[in-house]
Every structure is written in C-alpha cells, then in structure tokens.
Regions:
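Glycine-rich, proline-tolerant flexible connector loops at the mouths of alpha/beta enzymes
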Residues: 23-29, 56-65, 225
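Active-site-proximal beta-alpha core segment in soluble small-molecule metabolic enzymes
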Residues: 51-214, 236-239
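Generic N-terminal amphipathic, Lys/Arg-enriched alpha-helix
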Residues: 2, 10-29
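A short small-residue
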Residues: 18-23, 179-184, 218
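C-terminal active-site-proximal or functional interface alpha/beta core segments in diverse enzymes
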Residues: 189-267
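N-terminal glycine-rich anion-binding loops that anchor highly charged ligand groups
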Residues: 11-15, 41, 47, 52-60
Length: 267
C-alpha cells in the first residue's frame, strides 16, 4: 500500500458540535474566528521578524475570505496564470509566481501580474529572464537544498531524482539576473526541520550574499499549530535578514487555514 502523510489536525474543535444539516452538501464550512486567530499569529510573526508572509493560493484560495486574509498578510504566491490573476483581483499586495515550467504563450501575462518570478532552473532564467525583467519583476531561482526532512519520499522535493529546484551542488555561479533564492522542501512540519535545512544551505547563502536581495523559504511551516516553536522561528528569520541583508519571505497555505474549516459531503 502506498504510504500516506499523517494528518496534523488537532481534532474537530468547534466543528464537533456543528449541525451538518444546516448546510448544503457538498460545501466547505469555515470557522472565521479560527481563521482570524491563525492570521493574527502569522501577522505577529511577521511583525516580530520583519519577514513578509504570502498566502499560498494552491493550498487555500477561498477568495470570499480575501478581504480578511489581506488585512493580515503581505500578498499571495501563485503557481500559474490563473492563480496570478486571482491574486491580482482579490488579494493585492505582493504577488510571487513560481512553476516548475512556464508556457511561453502565458509568460508575458504572468510577468506583468507578478512582483517576483521564481524559475526552476538557470535554463529557464536564460529563456524567460529578460522578458520578466522588462515587465518589472524581480527574478528568483528555486534551489534544491539537497537536505531531506520529508517523512514520505514520494512527497519530498529533495528526494533522489527530484526536478524541483536546481541542486546546490550544480550551482557555481548564480545567473546575473537573479536577485533572490527560493526553496520549498518541507510539508506541514515544525521548526526543527527548517532550522536544520537553513543550517545546511547557509554556507551557500553566505557565499552569494552580495547578489541576493531576498530569500523565500517557501511553505510547509505549520506555524499555527500550538506546539510550533514560534520564538525560534522569529530568531532564525531575524538572523537571516540581518546577516544576509535580505528581505525574507514565507509562503503559507495550511498554516493560514489550519483547523479552520471542514468539507461537508455525503455518499
């Protein structure tokens, strides 16, 4: 049997007593109080560390709640043209776009919607970088830290054979157009895996700090789970900002909506 990732949910919470007959089926039901509490935690981390937190639309894109979300977060990250359009229309703030590959027919529109565009490889920077720069977007490169913290190999972006990001060992010089780096190698995890990953890549970051203006640590950080070490996170983000002289970003989806909603359905 294929191995599955365990749920991180803390239980039914307020939904334990929710009358499912009150709503149509199927539908998503959101606890707005719980959602706001999550957003307040994330905003506090941002304020304390100086890091900008973006909503990962691929994880939570209920745009009816965009007015609430954009009150607390700095923008959104998109994985393609339609998410970039959604971000522009409803969320405002900064828009970061990343995809393992971009379609040439869509790229102009994506570039004009985005503040940051993250490419998966130096080859993609060479192909689309000038186009992105002409549109006014800052250019980033996704790196593969080559440091695995994933519990399930098939979901691990650092697993052998992964094509998500450029392996650090293959990079001797960053493309000239690149002003920032992006990584995403965690999934619904605590602070310790992030700390170990940063420790693994920090020599590379220090070696290229003169070229870097920003660092995006991606998602997979379950910051709103009660046992997450938020003090440790703030210290780490602050240290990276100060020692590298960069703006630090996080892209969060599950942390935003963690234990704040249910899907009602029937068989």
């Amino acid at each position: 049997m294929s191995q599955l990732m365990p749920t991180q949910s803390q239980g039914a919470g307020n939904f334990a007593t929710f009358d499912l007959s009150r709503v149509p089926s199927p539908c998503f039901v959101v606890d707005e109080v719980a959602l706001r509490q999550n957003l307040e935690i994330l905003h506090a981390v941002s304020q304390a560390s100086g890091a900008e937190i973006l909503l990962a639309l691929k994880a939570f894109s209920m745009w009816s709640l965009a007015p609430l979300v954009r009150t607390y977060l700095s923008g959104a990250c998109a994985s393609g043209l339609w998410e970039a359009k959604l971000a522009k229309a409803h969320y405002g703030g900064q828009i970061t776009s990343y995809a393992p590959a971009f379609k040439a027919s869509e790229f102009d529109e994506i570039a004009n919607l985005s503040d940051h565009i993250v490419f998966n490889s130096p080859a993609q920077v060479a192909r689309f970088g000038a186009q992105a720069q002409q549109a006014g977007a800052a250019i980033g490169l996704r790196i593969n830290p080559q440091h695995s913290e994933g519990g399930v190999e098939k979901y691990d972006p650092c697993a052998a054979g992964s094509r998500l990001g450029q392996p650090l060992s293959d990079i001797t010089k960053l493309p000239d157009l690149v002003s920032g780096l992006h990584m995403h190698s965690l999934c619904e995890q605590g602070f310790a895996p992030l700390a170990r990953t940063v420790e693994a890549i920090e020599p590379f970051l220090q070696a290229h700090k003169q070229q870097l203006q920003w660092l995006n640590l991606g998602g997979g950080h379950l910051i709103t789970r009660p046992d997450y070490d938020r003090d440790g996170l703030v210290q780490l983000l602050t240290r990276l900002r100060d020692t590298l002289d960069v703006q630090v970003y996080l892209e969060l989806g599950t942390s935003v909506a963690f234990d704040a909603g249910i899907l009602v359905g029937e068989i």
